[in-house]
């Protein structure tokens, strides 16, 4: 089964722009980076050179690079050893615009990663580098090539990509946000959302569901993916003394999502308490911080910051965690034993978080570096998400409800002038508009929302 991915269009735009920079494609393990890059290379270039630093081809290229770089004191230094290495690796390599070089799992070799500047400045061909654990690049032997790269993040399948598998993408893209379509159209998308929130968007999991229509099989796939991630991650840590560190942190993050609703001052300390029940001496705060940073750099988790009283000038960073895949979120939340209505509400928030996260990564539509939620000290309330638009410089509140619940905090913030508009993203609705200030939208259409006064599509 071939999955159509939104990133393909971005790759075409990068090729057309021809900036001369190396493209760094980031993303979690098993989101389909290798597949889509090979497809892009085959379909858009006369010649593709593919090297995986985690496979035999990587060993072969390192051998070529070593031989091309050989030098003895007193002799002239070798000229353009990287070019010579590519010519040795592939006799048909030519440095022109009809050629693309793809270096996969580049985090496995600092020697090759440190050639990015050369690849950007001395070559005419297109170059893409990628890897699942690029967080390793914070180690001292990796020299970050500032100014010579641009990046794209590839994530698990988004909801519209998921719908494409089942032939419903056109309905998603054209359905009215505020209820003008037949009720059956909204119900159909809602049914697919109910599946998506449980299994998420990892390609192997989606293909499994498409083939068997069995959610329990998908849970097994997710469990295997997370187990492989944990095992592979451990080899990058010299200071791990608890072999189950990542499994414990996953469970602790899920518990923390359930326990806290106002944001906490020190997420690391809270996670340590949950994961280790305050057993002294087993893990240092530094080690926990290292592991959490790794999970973020590996695109497994993300965080949200808190805006006090919906004030974009009062932002408290790192105040809440979310998983970066709905299936992973559901898997670990379900494992806590929490009631399903609690889990369903948290999944709804996670879904909207991912939508805002994408807008921050891909557009200049909203302010901040991560999504924000907000507190309202006056009534000791909380707003699920707060958006400061860079399109009309208005303040938008978002209340997320998996059912048809009332949004008291959001409405009070609107009444008190802290917000200009309020979006109610609900699981049980067809959508509607009230007083040109409050907009009710089906939860599954979160990615269709834009933050400007027209309240429509781009």
Named regions from a protein language model:
Residues 142-259:
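Interdomain motor-coupling "hinge/lid" segment immediately C-terminal to the ATP-binding subdomain
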Residues 127, 352, 356, 383-404:
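Conserved catalytic cores of phosphodiester-cleaving nucleases, focusing on short active-site segments
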Residues 121-142:
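Sensor-1/coupling segment of RecA-like P-loop NTPase cores
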Residues 36, 40:
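Hydrophobic positions on the alpha1 helix immediately C-terminal to the Walker A/P-loop
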Residues 33:
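Conserved lysine of the Walker
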Residues 1-18:
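N-terminal pre-Walker A segment at the start of P-loop NTPase domains
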Residues 211-383, 389:
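Accessory nucleic acid-recognition modules appended to NTPase machines
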Residues 25:
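Hydrophobic anchor at the beta1->P-loop junction of P-loop NTPases
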């Amino acid at each position: 089964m071939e999955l159509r991915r939104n990133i393909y269009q971005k790759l075409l735009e990068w090729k057309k722009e021809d900036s001369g920079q190396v493209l760094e494609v980031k993303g979690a393990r098993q989101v389909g980076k290798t597949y889509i890059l090979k497809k892009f290379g085959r379909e858009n270039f006369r010649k593709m050179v593919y090297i995986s630093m985690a496979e035999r081809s990587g060993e072969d290229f390192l051998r070529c690079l070593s031989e091309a770089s050989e030098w003895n004191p007193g002799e002239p230094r070798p000229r353009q050893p990287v070019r010579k290495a590519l010519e040795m690796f592939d006799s048909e390599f030519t440095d022109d615009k009809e050629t693309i070089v793809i270096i996969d799992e580049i985090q496995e070799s600092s020697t090759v990663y440190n050639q990015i500047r050369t690849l950007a400045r001395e070559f005419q061909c297109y170059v893409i580098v990628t890897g699942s654990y690029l967080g390793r690049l914070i180690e001292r032997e990796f020299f970050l090539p500032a100014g010579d790269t641009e990046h794209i993040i590839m994530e698990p399948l988004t909801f519209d990509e998921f719908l494409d598998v089942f032939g419903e993408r056109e309905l998603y893209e054209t359905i009215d946000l505020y209820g003008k379509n037949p009720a059956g159209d909204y119900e159909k998308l809602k049914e697919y959302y109910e599946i998506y929130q449980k299994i998420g968007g990892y390609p192997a999991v989606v293909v499994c569901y498409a083939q068997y229509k069995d959610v329990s099989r998908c849970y097994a796939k997710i469990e295997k993916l997370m187990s492989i991630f944990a095992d592979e991650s451990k080899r990058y840590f010299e200071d791990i003394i608890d072999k189950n560190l990542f499994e414990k942190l996953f469970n602790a993050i899920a518990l923390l999502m359930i326990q806290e609703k106002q944001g906490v001052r020190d997420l690391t300390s809270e996670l340590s308490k949950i994961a280790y029940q305050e057993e002294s001496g087993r893990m240092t705060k530094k080690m926990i911080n290292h592991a959490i940073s790794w999970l973020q750099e590996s695109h497994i988790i993300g965080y949200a910051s808190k805006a006090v009283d919906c004030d974009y000038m009062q932002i408290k960073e790192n105040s809440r965690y979310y998983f970066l895949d709905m299936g992973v979120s559901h898997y670990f939340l379900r494992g806590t034993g929490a009631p399903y209505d609690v889990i369903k509400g948290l999944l709804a928030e996670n879904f909207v978080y991912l939508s805002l996260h994408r807008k921050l990564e891909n557009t200049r539509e909203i302010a901040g570096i991560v999504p924000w939620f907000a507190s309202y000290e006056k009534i000791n309330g909380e707003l699920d998400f707060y958006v400061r638009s860079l399109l009309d410089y208005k303040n938008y509140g978002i209340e997320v409800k998996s059912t048809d619940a009332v949004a008291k905090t959001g409405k009070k913030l609107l009444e008190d002038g802290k917000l200009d508009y309020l979006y109610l993203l609900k699981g049980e609705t067809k959508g509607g508009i009230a007083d040109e200030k409050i907009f009710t939208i089906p939860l599954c259409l979160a990615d269709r929302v834009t933050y400007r006064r027209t309240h429509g599509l781009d």
